[in-house]
Amino acid sequence: MKTPLTEAVSIADSQGRFLSSTQIQVLFGRFRQAKAGLXAAKAL
């Protein structure tokens, strides 16, 4: 299963580069949203 993280890493790798700081910030934002979603689901 591909996740946004593995997708971004594989694209950067295929282009022979590292992730940009913007891409890393977007990924951390997605992790924060996922964490908040899990916390909300647990509260139900």
Curated annotation (Swiss-Prot):
This protein's assembly is summarised as:
Heterodimer of an alpha and a beta subunit. The heterodimer further assembles into trimers and the trimers into hexamers.
Q: Does the keyword Cytoplasm apply?
A: no
As a miscellaneous remark, the entry gives: In cell culture induces a urokinase-type plasminogen activator; may therefore be useful in dissolving blood clots.
* Entry keywords, A to Z: Antenna complex, Bile pigment, Chromophore, Electron transport, Membrane, Photosynthesis, Phycobilisome, Thylakoid, Transport
By what name is this protein known? C-phycocyanin alpha subunit
- Cell location: Cellular thylakoid membrane
Report the protein's function.
Answer: Light-harvesting photosynthetic bile pigment-protein from the phycobiliprotein complex (phycobilisome, PBS). Phycocyanin is the major phycobiliprotein in the PBS rod.
**Mind giving the lineage of the organism this protein is from?**
Bacteria, Bacillati, Cyanobacteriota, Cyanophyceae, Oscillatoriophycideae
- State if Transport is listed as a keyword: yes
| Species this protein is from | Limnospira fusiformis
